[in-house]
């Protein structure tokens, strides 16, 4: 199973660009799919065709019956399942890496001389380069989750229609060139059934984690939106709490001008009265 090594290295980079549930999904994928499939599948399914026997001597009958019973090997089916389920995640990884690269260049321009005049600011990463899943990145993340759910469910249904979930020990076969309905036998059917059920349970857990993560992201988004909306309402009802200064209106300016004129008039009248009193005092002397 060395062909999955490169895929494992790529998926390992997704850990830093995922939610907590996404990290759990990656753990399930690595431990219970890639590692178990690589360690135990070959020993369990290595004799799948060599020990498939039919009670006939007709040349070609066993090969035809095996091909009819197993259109695709279980191992190859599960490898394809891992690759197809991981593809949306790898596409999201490419999108996230592109955004990180763009914002790294933007931070370099902002730190350069004259960069403070730039209006655009980094949106998806912080100073440490940690990705914030929001905006277009959130849409990309939700899209890859939806595609993983669809692909996972399709492979589970496909496995049921191709093989079923139980490996029976005997298969009747009447395909040509078999001269009659022959009976074909599979080695170690119980062990293979246990392995099939295990891989099915892991696929269902993976599907459930993807569904939970979709609801988690949607609920988090709705909660953040409601907080922002309530903050706007509170600020509108209590203007004094706003940090920006309150600019005077036209009505305020007119009131201020009227008060200034009244003050000047009262000061001029007061000055005239004081002058008349002083003149009268001098004449009396």
Swiss-Prot record:
Q: How does it sit in the membrane?
A: Multi-pass membrane protein
Keyword DNA-binding assigned: no
* Regions that span the bilayer: 20-40, 77-99, 149-171, 195-217
Q: Where in the cell is it found?
A: Cell membrane; Cell junction, Gap junction
Q: Which residues lie on this side of the membrane: Extracellular?
A: 41-76, 172-194
- InterPro entries on file: Connexin, Connexin_CCC, Connexin_CS, Connexin_N, Connexin_N_sf
Q: Where is the signal peptide?
A: none
Main localization of the protein described in the UniProt heading: membrane
The entry's protein name is: Gap junction Cx32.2 protein
């Amino acid at each position: 199973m060395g062909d999955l090594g490169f895929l494992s290295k790529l998926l390992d980079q997704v850990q830093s660009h995922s939610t907590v549930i996404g990290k759990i999904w990656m753990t399930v994928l690595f431990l219970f799919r890639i590692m178990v499939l690589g360690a135990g599948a070959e020993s369990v399914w290595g004799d799948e065709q060599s020990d498939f026997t039919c009670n006939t001597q007709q040349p070609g009958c066993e090969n035809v019956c095996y091909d009819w019973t197993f259109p695709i090997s279980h191992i190859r089916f599960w490898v394809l399942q891992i690759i197809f389920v991981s593809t949306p995640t790898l596409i999201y990884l490419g999108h996230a890496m592109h955004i990180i690269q763009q914002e790294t260049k933007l931070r370099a321009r902002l730190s350069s001389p004259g960069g403070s005049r730039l209006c655009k600011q980094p949106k998806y990463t912080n100073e440490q380069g940690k990705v914030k899943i929001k905006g277009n990145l959130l849409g990309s993340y939700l899209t890859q989750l939806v595609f993983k759910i669809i692909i996972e469910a399709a492979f589970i249904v496909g496995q049921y229609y191709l093989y079923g979930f139980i490996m029976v020990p005997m298969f009747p076969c009447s395909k040509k060139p078999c001269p009659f309905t022959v009976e074909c036998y599979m080695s170690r059917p119980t062990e293979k059934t246990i392995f099939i059920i295990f891989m099915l349970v892991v696929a269902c857990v993976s599907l459930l984690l993807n569904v939970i993560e979709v609801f988690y992201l949607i609920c988090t988004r709705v909660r953040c939106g409601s907080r922002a909306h309530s903050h706007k309402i509170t600020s509108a009802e209590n203007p004094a709490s706003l940090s920006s200064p309150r600019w005077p209106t036209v009505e305020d300016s007119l009131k201020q001008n009227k008060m200034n004129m009244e003050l000047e008039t009262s000061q001029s009248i007061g000055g005239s009265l004081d002058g008349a009193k002083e003149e009268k005092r001098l004449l009396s002397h």
